[in-house]
UniProtKB/Swiss-Prot annotation:
GO terms for biological process: cell division; protein folding; protein transport. GO terms for cellular component: cytoplasm. Its main location: cytoplasm. Residues 185-270 form the PPIase FKBP-type domain. Transmembrane segments: none annotated. It is an enzyme of class 5 (isomerase). The keyword Cytoplasm applies. Its EC number is 5.2.1.8. This is Trigger factor. It comes from Wolbachia pipientis wMel. One of its GO terms (molecular function) is peptidyl-prolyl cis-trans isomerase activity. It comes from the Bacteria.
């Protein structure tokens, strides 16, 4: 090994020496030096291995002159040796300084030996930077007391729910008055045709089509043209499709429309409760009441669960403190900003998420909580599958993308550990009204 070793270093082995550059909480930086003699020896050994099978025009495999092997493969051999040397020295150093686990090691090459010269200045020197994993405390269940909020469903809550159904599914009746002019909120049964340069375009015509004025079903301006029309009336008008219209062939195009109003229906009050129920598919009003109670109950359960989870998360964030790996926090912050857009407090929220994830990982290990296939599939189905994104597509992405796998597994572990903790800790029941529960939820 070369005698030209930097001062203030610690001799570790016959292969390398190291010098501590900085230690800041979880961050470590070291300068590692490997003598040129060692590198040359390893490069020569690698070249001899290559020579055994090297091929070149005019020479059989393994018969290439050694000087040609050196000329053709020296850089490849050096790269191979440098990579192996970095792996060995970095791993060995971490064992020596007793770093049990680390995150995202970074290597910066400072100097490489010049294999073409015989000198003592050609040591291989690189800087190793990494973060160690922090010592994470175990969550103490005995110290946690949460509020278990229960909402009492009253008659007024059921009435409000059914009133919302009336608004969504109004009771329409035909207008016989030939002089009646259609207005917002009315339902019109129409025939229409749309033409561009005198040609019908795809999807531009229909018979007995129902349109609610004010609903925005058609392109901007279409329903405005129908306002004021009478039953049996026909109207011709021009409209321009928006430049960003989803059908590219129609975007920005001017169209000629012809519309005939076949029928006008206006909303009217239901005659009795059973009529309300039947209008949306229930046999009688009592079944609608039961449906309303269930729907309100389900909504309250969802809000209650989110509230108690937030209370738990806030408690853990406030009562457990330890150093966080800055690289992981930075990655989480970038992921959040990519999904949600720039946030003023994204750094703080990223730190909270990383802290909770580490607390949950530690807790799951201590309490032997492991994920099942169903846990992972549940997250995929509930979080990522939608009418626009099919299950098979998400599953394929999960199987092929390691980063997405880690994200989904992390979410699944969070849900499982959170449910476990909430079940085990002390809880104080609090009865509130449905309105009060909604206010608490809206203030999250």
């Amino acid at each position: 090994m070369s005698n030209n070793i930097p001062q203030n270093t610690v001799e570790v082995s016959s292969v390398y020496t190291y010098k501590e550059l900085s230690i800041d909480k979880l961050k470590y930086e070291y300068e590692i030096t490997v003598g040129s003699d060692y590198i040359k020896q390893k490069v020569n050994s690698r070249l001899q291995e290559i020579a055994e099978n090297a091929k070149s025009p005019g020479f059989r495999a393994g018969k290439m002159p050694y000087d040609l092997v050196v000329a053709n493969y020296k850089n490849e051999a050096l790269e191979y040796v440098i990579n192996n040397t970095i792996d060995y020295c970095s791993s060995d150093l971490m064992k020596k300084i007793e770093v049990k686990s680390h995150i995202y090691p970074k290597v910066d090459v400072i100097s490489l030996p010049d294999l073409g010269k015989e000198n003592e200045e050609g040591n291989f020197v690189y800087k190793l930077s990494f973060e160690s994993m922090p010592e994470v405390p175990v969550i103490d269940l005995d110290k946690i007391n949460l509020k278990k909020i229960e909402a009492k469903i009253e008659e007024e809550d059921i009435k409000e729910f059914i009133d919302s159904i009336k608004t969504k599914f109004p009771n329409f009746a035909s207008v016989d008055d030939a002089s009646y002019q259609a207005k917002d909120g009315d339902k019109l049964i129409i025939d229409f045709e749309g033409r561009i340069r005198n040609k019908l375009f795809q999807g531009g015509s229909s018979k007995n089509f129902a349109v609610n004025l004010g609903s925005g079903t058609f392109i901007n301006g279409f329903e405005d043209q129908l306002t004021g029309m009478k039953k049996g009336e026909t109207k011709n008008f021009k409209l321009k499709f928006p430049e960003n219209y989803q059908a590219i062939s129609l975007a920005g195009q001017e169209a000629d429309f012809s519309v005939r109003v076949n029928e006008i229906q206006i909303a009217k009050d239901f005659e009795n409760d059973d009529e309300i129920a039947k209008s949306i598919g229930f046999k009688d009003y009592s079944l609608l009441i039961n449906h309303a109670k269930k729907m309100i109950g389900d909504q309250c359960t969802e809000m209650r669960n989110l509230l108690i989870k937030k209370e738990l998360f806030d408690y853990l964030d406030a009562n457990y403190s330890f150093d966080l790996p800055t690289d992981i926090v930075k990655q989480e912050q970038q992921r959040m900003e990519g999904e949600l857009g720039a946030q003023n407090d994204s750094r703080k929220e990223a730190e909270k998420r990383v802290k909770l994830a580490m607390l949950f990982m530690k807790f799951s290990a201590e309490h032997k909580i492991s994920l099942t296939q169903n846990d992972v599939l549940s997250v995929i189905v509930n979080q990522y599958v939608s009418k626009d994104v099919q299950f098979d597509r998400v599953l394929k992405h999960f199987e092929s993308n390691k980063q997405f796998q880690e994200l989904v597994r992390g979410q699944a572990l969070e849900y499982k550990v959170t449910d476990y903790i909430i079940e085990k800790v002390s809880k104080e029941e609090q009865i509130v009204s449905v309105k009060e529960l909604k206010e608490l939820f809206d203030n999250i």
